[in-house]
Amino acid sequence: MRKSSLDARRMKAIGAGLVTGLALSMIVSAAQAQTRQGGRAPLVLADEGTFYAGGHYDQDHPARHIVGQVFVEYRIPADLKHPFPIVLVHGGNQSGSGWFSTPDGRPGWAQYFLRQGYAIYVVDQVARGRSAVVPEAYGSVATAQPLQYVLEKFTSQERYKLWPQASLHTQWPGKAEPGDPAFDQYWSSDIPGMQNRTLQAQMNIDALAALFDRIGPAILLVHSQSGAYAWPLAQARPDLVKAIVAAEPAGPPVHDVVVQSAQVFDTPWEKAIKQTDDDYYRDNPGVKPYGLTSTPLAYTPPVTAASPLQFVHQDKPERRDLARCWRQAEPARKLVAVGDRPILVVEAEASFYAGYNHCNVEYLEQAGVHTTFIRLADIGIHGNGHMMMMEKNSDEIAQVMVDWLDKVVGPMEAKQR
């Protein structure tokens, strides 16, 4: 039963004196809540709830579990200002909880978008968080990320300097080390996903398509790993995915890359770069057969076994601190339907993605997909790592996304004219 129904029944059952007392209590509670939220007025919701989207009965194992479903938590603000909700899909080793609060206890992007008048739908990816894990159907769980890896890549890269931009990192809250309350909160949220990444991706794409079928047209916000779901989902539901906001989406195209200083020399990048004339970034040998993804993408002309995509490597990087990009051999095939909506890619200044986010954008553009690319440093937002939604200036970054959405999608009133 919803809270509004309970309140209505209670109000009918009490007298005028109790109503007055209740009103005073609500005023005090609201003031206390505003104090807890740093002076912000309490969030007022018109509706909230949870459900599961997608999934099917597993016919391959005796237990016949439902598999492939995602858990969804939704909240609709009382002051709804925008026609399309935002679907937030977390990245690797995370769950939807990371959208609701930062490790140091501030409201997260979910609350920020709610306060701007957006309804939100927050997903736990298949086999993560509150989406059930069914080992016989999903296979092995990936090995957990080592603590040292997380320190080097996500929270304290400025100490290790394993890629050119790492030393610019300043925005992680707290000391970014074990025992620090904010770091311990973040490390507590780490959840490994499936070992089979292609299966994981396809299950999530299918479940997200079912979610859009249920809720109707919406904006898709992805981060990191889930960025690879955005392009096939846009093709699967071309009329429902109204815009894509991609915070450092999975990449780069064709090959993942490794950083030589971390993998070869195990030294800070300034020293490593002096020891080789080779590329600073090296390609992982694995190939993404559809360029941006390992899961199928529709191209024109079509990709077939007899006519696969052909790729070429950029002769030299645009700068020494950037990776050389892989592109399609010309004439490039075009991605079907992906470019039929506004797309934003956001890059954080000190992230390990800062060396190759541009490769995703260039690949999309070559395939006929116009993309807005915002390097946060270019607009005066400095010091962020890959987990930008958890860092000290997270609200400032969310506002960049809101401003862009206001331009390309617009508020409710504009859609009603």
Where does each model-flagged region fall?
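Conserved acidic catalytic loop of the alpha/beta-hydrolase fold
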Residues: 171-173, 177-182, 188-191, 196-219
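Short beta-strand/loop motif that positions the catalytic acidic residue
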Residues: 339, 345-347
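N-terminal cap/lid segment of alpha/beta-hydrolase-fold proteins
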Residues: 35-81
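Conserved alpha/beta-hydrolase
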Residues: 106-133
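Short beta-strand element of the alpha/beta-hydrolase
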Residues: 82-91
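Short substrate-entry loop that stabilizes the transition state in hydrolases
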Residues: 92-104, 110, 129-130, 253-254, ...
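Catalytic active-site module of serine/aspartate enzymes centered on a nucleophile-bearing elbow/loop
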Residues: 381-383, 387-417
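Gly/Ala-rich beta-loop-alpha elbow adjacent to hydrolase catalytic centers
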Residues: 221-230
